[in-house]
Amino acid sequence: MNINQTLKQYFGYDSLRTGQEELINGILAGHDVLGIMPTGAGKSLCYQLPALMLKGITLVISPLISLMSDQVKALNQAGVHAAYINSSLTENQIRMALSYASQGRYKIIYVAPERLNTQRFLDFACNADISMLTVDEAHCISVSYTHLTLP
C-alpha cells in the first residue's frame, strides 16, 4: 500500500497537509527527521502513517496519559493495533501489553518517559523489532552539554 492509500484507508484523508509529506517520505527513506509544527497541524499523522508502512513496531514517547489514551483509542477505532504503557496500568496489564507487542500484535506503542528506564521495558526493547522511535512532546528531550567547555 502506498502513502495515499494508507492515508485514506486508516485516517480518511485524501491528501496531506503542508510539511507532512516531506516528513513522512524522510521517515520511509530511513532518515532521521525533525518536525516542528504548531498544535493541530497534524504532527501525529507524520509518525502514525509511516508506522503502518514499516515492518516493525513504532515506539512513541509521550508524557501525557490522556493524550496516549486518546491516540490509542482513535487508532484502534481506525483499525490500527496500538497500545500504551504508563502508570495508569497495573503490572499485569503492562506485562500483557509488552508480551502482545513482542508477538507483533501492535504497530504503535505509546510509552511514558519514566517507563523507558524500567528493567521490564529495557528487556522488551532489546528484543523487539523496533522500526521507529518518536518523541511526541519536545519537553521529553533532554540534551546535556556537560562535556563542552563554553567561553
Model-inferred region functions:
Residues 69-90, 100:
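Conserved helix-turn-beta segment of the N-terminal RecA-like "Helicase ATP-binding" lobe
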Residues 29-34, 56, 106-107:
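Pre-Walker A (Motif I) flank of P-loop NTPase domains
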Residues 1-36:
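Conserved pre-motif I regulatory segment
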